[in-house]
């Protein structure tokens, strides 16, 4: 018997089918093969058509089932991971009223800023744990003002994962975790935030019924089953945003555990066992997948924009022509820790939330024409990225998160020995690398929700550990010294 996971990304839809007994992936596919388009009608806007996601899901699902050589009756449950914060609006016929305003669209920033000021910063942070910012509620406020005809026709609002679940099951439901990422959830009262809804003038009727993150959220309809080759009544038993789901995929569920990614941008996602917030709003706090009223489990999310994109820029523009990433790592390894005094601040991909939304751009410090080479630049870029991670993780420490372990997929910058050693050394934390992805995590989440697995520990018992990186005492001291120099240069630049 099998479990199916869908990962609804902004670039593609990924589907994995997992054998429930072995926990191994037996089939996977993704679509589109080229990156999905994002429409930007104006600077700072970003939209996608939710019906395109649904088309991609159907293609990827059929492809994964074909590769796995399974039939619909073999699939016991479906789980969904999705790009966070996007706004989908539908009418009473469940028809999409406008393109989705997705996570990277910034048009709603002024609405969130005004709400933060008018509701009160302290009250927002103590109840919502965040500023309303550029999140889903603020995106809806933009529609209310600029597209009132559409707003008046809205039956329900949804996140991207809610929409795909609706297309599969015909049911419109959401989760506490989803409402919290939209900044609709009052953590102090454990309920929909009446204060925020009243401030924006939203009717409670717009909000979907709440279901558990793990548990029955709907069943595949007869028409969808016939179209996709699924069995009618196949349950959808899990959904979560991509970052909480990535943490689940890495079995990051308890306080002190950290999930990290090092792609174009970087994410550090830590679990906090206390209801807490950053008074400067440098990180965001949402309900984690296993958060309940009885057991606090909050996901503290730190995003760093300038991560893999800096390493890629160095490869294209500074490194010797034709070099690959492994060769770039070898080149960087010829330079000592600290790069003979050279530092790079990796903030050249837009404003950074952990710097209180300041856009300071990327900059090079301590450059000496008689000492420094391309190799120094290659290493300083990776060290600068690591030090940005450390800077953000120190904010998490201030919030009371005692970081015990960092878990990541064996991909992107975590393939670099320099990056791994530097991160372990400067944070004094063990790094564990695993072979997993979001669609696999969603499939296993479905297994938990369907009761096939007793708990996450059983679901992820087969999680394959690729590597463990321990902090090296001598190197750690050198990295910590280099970090202090980097941090001083950052503070002079802010």
List the model feature ranges, each with a label.
Residues 31-33, 212, 471:
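Active-site donor-binding loop signature of nucleotide-sugar glycosyltransferases
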Residues 105:
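Carbohydrate-associated surface elements
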Residues 208-216, 328-331:
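Short linear loop/turn motifs
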Residues 1-98, 110, 114, 126, ...:
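N-terminal glycine/serine-rich phosphate-binding loop of ATP-dependent small-molecule kinases
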Residues 204:
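Divalent-metal (Mg2+/Mn2+/Ca2+)-assisted nucleotide/phosphate chemistry catalytic cores
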Residues 3-5, 17, 109, 116-173, ...:
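Active-site core segments that coordinate phosphate-bearing ligands/cofactors
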Residues 83, 215, 411:
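Flexible loop residues that form catalytic
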């Amino acid at each position: 018997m099998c479990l199916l996971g869908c990962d609804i990304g902004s670039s593609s839809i990924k589907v994995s089918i997992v054998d429930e007994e072995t926990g191994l992936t037996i089939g996977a596919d993704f679509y589109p093969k080229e990156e999905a388009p994002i429409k930007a009608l104006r600077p700072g806007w970003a939209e996608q058509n939710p019906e395109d996601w649904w088309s991609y899901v159907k293609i990827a699902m059929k492809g994964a089932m074909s590769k796995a050589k399974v039939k619909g009756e073999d699939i016991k449950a479906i789980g969904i991971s999705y790009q966070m914060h996007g706004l989908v609006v539908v009418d009473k016929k469940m028809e999409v009223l406008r393109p989705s305003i997705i996570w990277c669209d910034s048009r709603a920033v002024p609405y969130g800023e005004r709400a933060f000021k008018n509701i009160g910063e302290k009250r927002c942070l103590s109840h919502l744990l965040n500023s309303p910012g550029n999140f889903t509620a603020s995106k809806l406020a933009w529609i209310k003002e600029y597209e009132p005809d559409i707003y008046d026709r809205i039956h329900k609002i949804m996140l991207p994962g809610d929409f795909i679940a609706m297309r599969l099951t015909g049911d419109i439901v959401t989760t506490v975790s989803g409402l919290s990422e939209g900044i609709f959830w009052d953590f102090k009262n454990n309920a929909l935030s009446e204060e925020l809804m009243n401030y924006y003038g939203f009717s409670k009727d717009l909000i979907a019924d709440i279901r558990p993150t793990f548990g029955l959220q709907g069943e595949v309809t007869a028409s969808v089953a016939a179209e996709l080759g699924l069995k009618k009544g196949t349950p959808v038993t899990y959904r979560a945003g991509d970052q909480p789901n990535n943490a689940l995929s890495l079995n990051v569920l308890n306080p002190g555990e950290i999930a990290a990614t090092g792609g174009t941008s970087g994410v550090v996602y830590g679990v906090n066992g206390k209801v807490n917030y950053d008074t400067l709003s440098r990180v965001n706090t949402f309900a984690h997948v296993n958060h309940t009223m009885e057991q606090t489990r909050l996901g503290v999310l730190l995003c760093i924009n300038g991560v893999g994109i800096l390493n890629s820029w160095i490869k294209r523009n500074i490194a010797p022509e034709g070099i690959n990433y492994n060769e770039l790592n070898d080149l960087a390894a010829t330079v000592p820790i600290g790069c003979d005094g050279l530092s790079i601040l990796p903030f050249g991909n837009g404003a950074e939330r952990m710097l209180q939304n300041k856009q300071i751009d990327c900059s090079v410090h301590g450059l000496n024409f008689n000492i420094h080479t391309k190799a120094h630049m290659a290493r300083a870029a990776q060290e600068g990225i690591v030090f940005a991670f450390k800077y953000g993780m120190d904010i998490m420490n201030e919030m009371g998160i005692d970081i015990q372990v960092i878990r990541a997929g064996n991909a992107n910058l975590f393939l670099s020995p320099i990056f791994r050693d530097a991160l372990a050394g400067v944070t004094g934390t063990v790094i564990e690398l695993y072979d997993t992805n979001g669609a696999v995590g969603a499939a296993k989440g479905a297994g938990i929700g369907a009761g096939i697995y007793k708990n996450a520990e059983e679901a992820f018992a087969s999680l394959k550990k690729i590597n463990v990186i321990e902090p090296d005492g001598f190197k750690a001291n050198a990295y910590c010294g280099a970090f202090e120099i980097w941090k001083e240069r950052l503070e002079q630049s802010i």
